[in-house]
């Protein structure tokens, strides 16, 4: 008897509140649809961004981390929207999320600035893995660009780790960006040397050197009158990968040609005058 009464009461409630009931069920269904669509959108967006970053040769660690941020941002927005559809007040939830974000941001201010700088570095592509650079006064080859720092390998094999925010706020010198590098050396000769003859000899050496870029200007000029020498500035453009070896070979060839023409490279001389006094 009681069971029939309860069923009858439920039936009467549904009959009296069927519009509200249908609206509530509709909101639940809409909420579920939003969750499904939002989840699918997060996956698709993550995949698109990841493929884009792979094509741009962006570091895999950066791309995965950035994709995770996009994914969870979409999911949080989806969940909040879904809860709002079923009548839950989302204002307080948004306030809590905002407060938590501010607290985390203040606690991780340095790390977040490093991360933001890292994103800028890989996006703007100031340098790539393997480039020879000067970052914050440190010279070496780029080993990796990570989320919070960049690793550089120096000539003597040291691994230097530099925070990304320091890199982005200082001068970046990339020696690998251009195809050619400027070779610059100083050649010193005796004061008795014929200036015109010295310049002709050096220019002839540079013109015969196949690794010197002929399309660019060659410079040989008297730069300084030293304490015991005439100092000539010698400039020429070479391919960046051959800079060291070419510079060494050019110096050797110039020395040989100067010797052939009996033009000496001086060394510093010190005159010592000794004064003697007669003993009384």
Swiss-Prot record:
Cytoplasmic face residues: 50-64, 109-280
UniProt entry tagged with the keyword Cell membrane: yes
Topological domains, Periplasmic: 1-27, 86-87
Cleaved signal peptide residues: none
Protein's cellular compartments: Cell inner membrane
InterPro entries attached to this UniProt entry: LSM_dom_sf, MS_channel_1st, MS_channel_C, MSC_TM_helix, MscS_archaea/bacteria_type, MscS_beta-dom_sf, MscS_channel_2nd, MscS_channel_C_sf
Taxonomy, superkingdom: Bacteria
Membrane topology: Multi-pass membrane protein
Keywords per UniProt: Cell inner membrane, Cell membrane, Ion channel, Ion transport, Membrane, Plasmid, Transmembrane, Transmembrane helix, Transport
Presence of the UniProt keyword Nucleotidyltransferase in the record: no
Coiled coil, from the record: none
Classification via SUPFAM superfamilies: Mechanosensitive channel protein MscS (YggB), C-terminal domain (SSF82689), Mechanosensitive channel protein MscS (YggB), transmembrane region (SSF82861), Sm-like ribonucleoproteins (SSF50182)
Family affiliation: Belongs to the MscS (TC 1.A.23) family.
Subunit organization: Homoheptamer.
Protein name: Small-conductance mechanosensitive channel
Organism phylogeny: Bacteria, Pseudomonadati, Pseudomonadota, Gammaproteobacteria, Enterobacterales
């Amino acid at each position: 008897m009681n069971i029939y009464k309860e069923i009858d009461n439920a039936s009467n409630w549904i009959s009296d509140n069927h519009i509200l009931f249908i609206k509530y069920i509709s909101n639940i269904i809409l909420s579920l649809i939003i969750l499904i669509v939002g989840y699918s959108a997060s996956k698709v967006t993550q995949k698109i961004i990841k493929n884009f970053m792979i094509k741009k040769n962006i570091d895999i660690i950066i791309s995965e981390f950035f994709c995770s941020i996009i994914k969870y941002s979409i999911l949080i927005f989806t969940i909040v929207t879904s809860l709002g559809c079923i009548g839950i007040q989302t204002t307080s939830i948004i306030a809590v999320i905002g407060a938590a974000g501010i607290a985390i941001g203040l606690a991780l201010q340095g790390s977040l600035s490093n991360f933001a700088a890292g994103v800028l570095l890989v996006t703007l592509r100031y340098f790539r893995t393997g480039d020879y650079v000067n970052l914050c006064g440190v010279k070496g080859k780029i080993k990796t660009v990570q989320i919070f720092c960049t690793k550089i390998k120096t000539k003597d094999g040291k691994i230097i780790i530099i925070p990304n925010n320091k890199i982005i706020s200082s001068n970046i010198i990339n020696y690998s960006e251009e195809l050619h590098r400027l070779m610059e050396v100083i050649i010193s000769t005796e004061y008795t040397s014929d200036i015109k003859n010295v310049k002709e000899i050096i220019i002839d050496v540079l013109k015969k050197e196949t690794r010197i870029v002929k399309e660019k200007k060659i410079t040989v000029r008297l730069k300084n009158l030293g304490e015991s020498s005439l100092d000539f500035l010698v400039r020429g453009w070479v391919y960046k990968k051959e800079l060291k070896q070419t510079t060494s070979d050019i110096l050797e060839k110039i020395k040989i040609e100067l010797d052939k023409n009996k033009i000496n490279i001086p060394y510093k001389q010190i005159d010592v005058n000794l004064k003697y006094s007669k003993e009384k």
